[in-house]
Amino acid sequence: ALWRGLQSGNLQTTATDHCCFCADQKAAGKDDFRKIPNGTGGVENRMEVLWHHGVSTGRLTMNEFVAVTSTNAAQIFNVYPRKGSISVGADADIVVWDPEATKTISAKTHFQKVDYNIFEGMTVKGCASHTLSQGKVVYADGKLDVERGAGRYVHRPPFASYYEALQIQAQRNQPTPVKR
């Protein structure tokens, strides 16, 4: 059902509830599941897993992948075309994707500060080869090179036109009375 939602456009984005807790912290709930801290790491491998199970299998096109991982979120958060597009005047935040690259996901090699990975041992086809942030290469061929504090606030104007379009669509889908 989720794949059909992405394919049809009823689901516009993909995300993770990225909230890392180490195995010892998770073990706090071994006798009472209510004490298990919620969340797990997922943001680092989200795009790889989505490409592998989506584009590589034919469930999604490359354009749909870009939409659900970037463009749609930028539109929803009203930062498009500054974010979510490669165009004149846009921020130079770009992921260069190698659709043929393969990788086996492991906690031993990930960048997250947690001692396990929910995708441990999964081999995926399709990975980022380079990432640029503000025009600077911050990831290349498996090596991360970021400066602490290099991020910056991105102003979000209110009232994205995206929501207006959703309201118009909802109005059009309302039942219309038939006079008899």
List where the protein language model places each region:
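Short, positively charged
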Residues: 63-64, 105-112, 165-167
